[in-house]
Amino acid sequence: MIKKTFLVEIGTEELPSNILKKIILVFYKNFVDELSFNKILYKNINYFSTPRRLALQIIELDTSEKINEKIKKGPAIKHAFDENGNPTKAAYYWAKSCKINLNQAERLKTKTGEWIIHRIQEKKEKIELLFPKIIEKILKQINLKNTMRWETTNLRFIRPIRNIVMLLDEKIIKSEVFNVPSNNFLYHHISCKEEKIYIKNAIEYPAVLFKKNKIIANYETRKEKIKYEAKKIAKKVDGIIKTNPFLLEEVTSLVESPQALLARFKKDYINYIPKKILIHTIEKQQRCFSIYSNNSKKEILPYFIFISNIKSKKNKEIILGNEKVMHARLSDAMFFLKQDRKRKLENYLPFLKKVSFYNNLGTLYEKTLRLKLLIESISCYTNTINKNDLIRSAVLSKCDLITQMVDEFPELQGTIGMYYALENKENKEVAIAIKEQYLPSFSGDELPSTPIGCLLSISDKIDTLSGMFAIGETPTPEKDPFGLRRAALGILRIIITKKIPIDLKKIIEISLKIYTFKKVNYSIISKKIIKFFISRLSFFYEKKGYSTKVIKSVLSCKLTEPLDIDKRINAISDLKKIESIILIAKRIDNIVKNNHQIISSEIHVELMKKTEEKNLLKEIKIFNSKTKELFIQKKYKEILVEIKKLEKPIDNFFDKVQINHSNFEIRQNRLLLLIKIQKFFLKIANFSYLY
């Protein structure tokens, strides 16, 4: 076995920071799959990524020439030779197709018989020829939305590819990938005058990059260095940094030669700009780390840490430049706040008349009026809310969209409204709801923390869904430009997690009527929206690891209360030893299905001849008595426990009682007993999906 180190580095123009990690992981995983498919052995693979390079280093790669053996199977011996041992036509034709004489064929015995075979030995394609093909294939497989073409090529990738390095130890693999010839030099840091770094051996990577210009090619190493340096610098001003994984990932993806530097801003900004807006400006807009006081208050300090992409002797100038940019951003925020505060939040309401919500769905002012009516109609689902506060939150919900702050910082919609509402002495619950109406804004995001926030968020999303479905702007498998899937899932998460007993059918019908559409069939649109919600529910439970059978058994019942659905799914999933109940349900279903002639709906005691059927009726009555209140309270776990208690009398009934009695009335009476039990099951789920 000949072991060597292989290196491939794809040099590109600046890659998008938000997908850098995803790109290299896809590149790595697909390469591992290709090695496995081609049965190529190796010790391990290291992967590297910076804004301008993607690289893989394969350690102890087996490069020895191997021979692949293929067996071409011919006819069975009994068909290949006649009784006298002479070859048949089938054998001759097979040998001809293999381009051999029959005397070159071998025999192979298997469990199924004996066959003639031909062994074909082929040399495996050399690594030098195979790997360039694999690399180009994988790069084409990286399916991301925003790919581009460059120069005269029709090939597509996320960013133009400018350099390819392919080394097998010290040997350059001469080939092309995406029409770019391979070589043995890496591109320097973007700020370096010396363009090229020559690499002698694949094993030198990534040390050669760090030695030449402190480039840290390993993503995780770079991230840890940034985190360590930021914490170290914060201590110099008696501060700490809070963990912000999104910011850390973004900054790591933006630099390849990181250096953390400390800068400051005026303390006046802390006193005037609300804390969350200040943090948003520093972290989200400027991609810097905020510093907090190292005490229980965790107040923000007038400093920030930024990550430079270069080691420089001119750090003072770099710091000064970043301070000027930060001052400009914070100064803008202060100016916009001053301008916005000249009006009360509620005084922005009339200006919403000039802002369109969406074509054929009116203005934001009209949406506000719809929210007011809708939220009032669903206030009955919770008793802990002040109705006036609920309506007030709807009225003020969109007012901050007109402000200069939201115009400049659109990501802060809702948050700005909350601060202005608090400054205007609105109730705290109203202010928080204004902020929380947009939650959850992405998968796994936090949910509204207050009852008013929950209902406002649900109302806002239901209004959008109803309107978009009514005008035909529904999601497709490829596109969902209005985030309707996310909105529906957000509604379901709030309802289920916060245990709000909302009936989707009712609030969708109310929402559609509030719109007052002309030439719209509300019934059809409502059914489409419900179907859409059910598909999202199925996705929700599948993602959480619930059994597909259990999900289908409940969703097939055409229920429209997500909380009720959740209780049923959890009851069936949690109950131990439910298999015996499922078997009973199956047996009853099969018997009832094969007997269609049920005329009467009443059970007649006088027709009962056997003790077992009388006992079963008695147990059914006890069950009805015990579960009447449980069904009202939707305590399905307790109901299933009670159903399990029917198991023994049902078994006795099946063992001792002949259901298909010759007397029609007796037969019908016995079937009615089973139908009663069948209805108990159907009041929880369709158990036919479980067996």
From Swiss-Prot:
Report the PROSITE patterns cross-referenced here: AA_TRNA_LIGASE_II_GLYAB (PS50861)
What keywords appear on the UniProt entry? Aminoacyl-tRNA synthetase, ATP-binding, Cytoplasm, Ligase, Nucleotide-binding, Protein biosynthesis
Which family does the record assign? Belongs to the class-II aminoacyl-tRNA synthetase family.
Output this protein's name.
Glycine--tRNA ligase beta subunit
Single GO term (MF): ATP binding
Q: Which domain of life does the protein's organism represent?
A: Bacteria
GO BP terms: namely: arginyl-tRNA aminoacylation; glycyl-tRNA aminoacylation
Q: Which InterPro entries does the UniProt entry name for this protein?
A: DALR_anticod-bd, Gly-tRNA-synth_bsu, Gly-tRNA-synth_heterodimer
Q: Where in the cell is it found?
A: Cytoplasm
User: How does it associate, per the subunit comment?
Assistant: Tetramer of two alpha and two beta subunits.
Protein source organism: Buchnera aphidicola subsp. Schizaphis graminum (strain Sg)
